[in-house]
Each structure stands twice: as structure tokens, then as C-alpha cells.
């Protein structure tokens, strides 16, 4: 299905949904009360109404919400201050930007520390931080209360050249009220529960899932979604629809499943491994066709076999998204003869930790590359002055053609195409060889066909 057709269906669906209820009103924030804070030019707190004690430790939620707590504890939200890769990047940011680097990363990886002004610059490893006497609210990273004390929507983080933190939060912790998406929450003796429709909107994932720096669209998952006309106008197919799927009992999954894997686990044993695999398998479709070009049933020796491949995104943001510069998705194409021998290949790696051959002229690779001030390749967003974007846009199609000259007397040829994904380019893990061995490559989609040779 073409991009225009998919968008048309989306817009039509939105019109139908909206028109079904003549009394429908736009979602508005029910309670816009929030506590205030002031930042200086370096992104540091100069005054704040927030205190660490106002936020509940996530473990306090476990007794009444054991499933939600368990899911959160396995999520990347709970892992934000435990990830060795984050600590490496954070150290580099602090080295390059001594006045602002610490706060720049903390603004999203630890909102409680950011809003209360808690300085975390003394901690260079997760072991140091978790072994410290810091309160649990800080160690939790992105805790339950960070989201469930939200009262109104935030905006994209636009960082300037000095990368000073500017994250915009609207939270109301410490007042005995938890906000969420349930319209008629059950009363309980522990806290007041208030419905807020913003919990069904993609904007709830701001400010952290949309970042520009020096005008460079470095991590813009929300913007990618927001640029789709049908979705932006209606709010249909929100982030939560895919990443917090509704369960049979009406509650939502709190794994926040994306594409990031906790690499501290042995290969394939991360708690979210299977969920990530399922999510990625629903992200794209690939076919041997493009408009009037199709794969032939047979071919003669001496002819050129044209292999048309159409990659169609089924995803409401780019592939890859988020830290797209560290991620890569690509097509692996293998042709075998009737003896099973490989006679052509593109996008093949020997193992999960091997880098792609970027000199392969046939390689179809979806990724981005950050560029520094002098046009050099860089790996850190804090040093990005431009970006080369070769990602697959939301709900778009990408056509790629492979040509193979048939020179042997084989009875048939077998063509296998797979779309593969990994959350880190191997060189991004050079400082963490212990984690590199746990890096998975996921198969997103695969197709296969056989071409017979004419006698």
C-alpha cells in the first residue's frame, strides 16, 4: 500500500471517528496546576518549588500496583540511571561542556534531580550512584511519579550552542494526587486519583522524546509523528497505542517497549527481548515489486536478473528513530544457486558485532549520521552541528533495485531478503566490549522466492 493511500485512510478514519460524536470536544487539560522552577543560562536551578520528598519512590507503588511496578522495573525508564552507555556519554558531555553537560543529560534521564537541583556530577558509574546515600527517588531515574504527577503538556527541548538544559515540565507532586488515563478511577485511601485526557496524547512523551540542538533535529520521535497530517490533526495512533498497549482489563502495559535492549543481560535474556522482537516484526513490510516491475518466474543465462524490493513502513515515526544515529536497519540480500552456494550477497554480516560494509554499493541502509562543526562524523549529540538523515520516514515507501548477471548453468536461483535491525552500531560500543557481545540483531521482515533458468 502506497504512502498516499495509507495517509488517506488515516485521515478518513480520523474524520469518521470525530464525526461519530457530534458532542465531542477537544481534549483539554483538566488540571493545569503545576509547581514552578527557574533555570539560569547554564540550565541550573536558581529557584524551585519541587523537593525530592514530594516525589514518591516507585517502590511505594508496588503494593497496590504490583504488575505495573514489575513492568516499569524492567523498562528502559527504570534503566536511565543504570545504563553504562549513558554514563559514558554523560561523562563526555561533562568533559566537553563543564558548565552545562551534567544538567543537559540529567534533564531527561533524571527529571527529579533536574527539578530539585540535585547535582549528580560526582557519580561516574551506576554502581557509585546506586551505592550512594541518595534517595530512591533519584535512583529511580524516570519514576512512576514523574509521569503520574503530570498535569499539562510540555514542549520540545530546543538546546542552544552551550547545550544548557531547558526542559519544560508541568508536574504537581507531593499533594496526594495521581493523574492518569482512567476516566472513573476507583477511590482508595492512599491518594486521590484524577483523570486527565493528556495521558492519551503523544505530547505526554515530551519533553524527553523530542530534542533539537543548534537547530539540528537530533532526536525527534514526536516531531516525526506530528508531521503526519492525519495523526497530527486528530491525535490518532498515539505513542501510547503502540508503546503502552491496552490490556484486556483496560489498564496499559508499562514496559514502554521500544527498540532498546538492556545489554547487561546475556544475549537474548533481556526482559524485553521478546516484546521488542514482536514490535519490530510489525514495523515494516517488504515485497518483490515496485509499480510495474516484478520479479520474473524464469530467466535465461546471459540475462540480467532485476530484483525489485519495496520497503513499506508501517510505523508512525521514522525507522530508526530516537537516537537514530546509533541505530541501523538494513536489507540483507542473498542469492543462492541450486547447490545452496551463495553467488551474490549484500548487507551480510558475519556476526552481530561485525560492522556493515559501507563500501557495498548495493547496501540499503536506514540510519542517520551526526556531523561536527568542521563536517567530521561525531557520535555525540552534544557535538552535532548537522545531520545526514537516511532513515525511513513514517508510513513511507522505499524502492531499491538489485541487479545480478546470470552467468552459470544453474537450474534455479533462490533469493532471500531480510530487513534487519540493531539498536547500536558496533563502534558505538567500543568502550563497552562486555556489552557488545550481548548485542542482538533483530529480523524485522523476510521474503523469499525462486527463479528458474530457462533451458
PLM feature segments, named:
Residues 18-19:
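C-terminal motif of bacterial Sec signal peptides marking the signal peptidase cleavage site
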Residues 26-52, 71-97, 122-385, 390-394, ...:
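Primarily the internal scaffold of c-type cytochrome electron-transfer domains
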Residues 63, 82-121:
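Long, well-ordered hydrophobic secondary-structure segments characteristic of membrane-embedded
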Residues 2-10:
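Sec-dependent signal peptide recognition
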Residues 304, 410-414:
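Extracellular Ig-like/FN3 beta-sandwich strand-entry sites
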Amino acid at each position: 500500500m502506497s504512502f498516499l493511500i495509507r495517509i488517506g485512510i488515516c485521515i478518513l478514519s480520523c474524520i469518521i471517528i470525530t464525526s461519530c460524536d457530534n458532542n465531542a470536544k477537544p481534549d483539554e487539560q483538566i488540571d493545569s496546576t503545576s509547581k514552578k522552577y527557574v533555570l539560569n543560562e547554564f540550565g541550573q536551578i536558581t529557584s524551585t518549588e519541587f523537593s525530592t520528598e514530594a516525589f514518591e519512590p516507585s517502590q511505594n507503588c508496588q503494593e497496590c500496583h504490583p504488575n505495573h511496578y514489575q513492568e516499569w522495573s524492567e523498562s528502559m525508564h527504570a534503566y536511565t540511571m543504570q545504563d553504562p552507555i549513558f554514563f559514558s556519554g554523560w561523562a563526555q558531555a561533562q568533559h566537553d561542556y563543564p558548565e552545562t553537560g551534567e544538567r543537559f543529560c540529567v534533564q531527561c534521564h533524571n527529571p527529579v534531580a533536574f527539578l530539585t537541583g540535585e547535582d549528580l556530577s560526582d557519580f561516574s558509574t551506576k554502581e557509585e550512584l546506586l551505592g550512594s546515600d541518595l534517595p530512591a527517588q533519584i535512583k529511580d531515574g524516570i519514576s512512576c511519579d514523574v509521569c503520574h504527577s503530570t498535569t499539562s503538556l510540555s514542549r520540545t527541548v530546543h538546546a542552544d550552542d552551550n547545550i544548557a538544559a531547558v526542559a519544560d515540565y508541568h508536574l504537581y507532586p507531593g499533594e496526594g494526587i495521581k493523574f492518569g488515563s482512567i476516566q472513573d478511577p476507583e477511590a482508595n485511601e492512599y491518594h486521590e486519583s484524577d483523570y486527565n485526557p493528556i495521558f492519551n496524547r503523544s505530547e505526554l512523551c515530551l519533553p524527553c522524546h523530542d530534542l533539537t540542538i543548534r537547530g539540528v533535529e537530533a532526536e525527534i520521535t514526536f516531531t516525526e509523528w506530528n508531521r503526519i497530517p492525519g495523526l497530527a490533526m486528530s491525535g490518532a495512533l498515539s505513542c501510547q497505542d503502540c508503546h503502552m498497549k491496552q490490556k484486556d482489563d483496560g489498564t496499559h502495559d508499562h514496559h514502554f517497549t521500544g527498540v532498546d535492549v538492556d545489554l547487561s543481560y546475556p544475549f537474548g535474556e533481556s526482559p524485553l527481548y521478546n516484546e521488542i522482537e514482536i514490535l519490530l516484526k510489525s514495523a515494516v513490510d517488504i515485497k518483490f515489486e515496485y509499480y510495474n516491475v516484478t520479479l520474473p518466474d524464469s530467466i535465461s543465462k546471459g540475462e540480467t536478473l532485476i530484483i525489485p524490493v519495496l520497503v513499506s513502513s508501517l510505523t508512525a515515526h521514522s525507522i530508526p528513530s530516537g537516537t537514530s544515529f546509533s541505530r541501523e536497519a538494513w536489507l540483507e540480500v542473498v542469492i543462492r544457486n541450486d547447490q545452496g552456494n551463495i553467488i551474490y550477497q549484500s548487507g551480510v554480516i558475519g556476526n552481530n558485532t561485525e560492522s556493515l560494509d559501507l563500501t557495498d554499493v548495493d547496501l540499503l541502509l536506514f540510519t542517520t549520521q551526526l556531523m561536527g562543526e568542521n563536517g567530521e562524523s561525531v557520535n555525540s549529540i552534544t557535538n552535532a552541528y548537522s545531520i545526514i538523515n537516511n532513515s525511513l520516514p513514517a508510513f513511507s515507501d522505499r524502492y531499491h533495485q538489485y541487479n545480478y548477471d546470470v552467468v552459470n548453468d544453474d537450474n534455479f536461483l533462490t533469493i532471500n531478503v531480510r530487513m534487519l535491525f540493531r539498536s547500536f552500531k558496533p563502534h558505538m560500543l567500543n568502550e563497552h566490549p562486555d556489552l557488545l557481545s550481548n548485542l542482538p540483531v533483530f529480523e524485522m521482515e523476510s521474503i523469499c522466492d525462486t527463479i528458474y533458468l530457462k533451458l
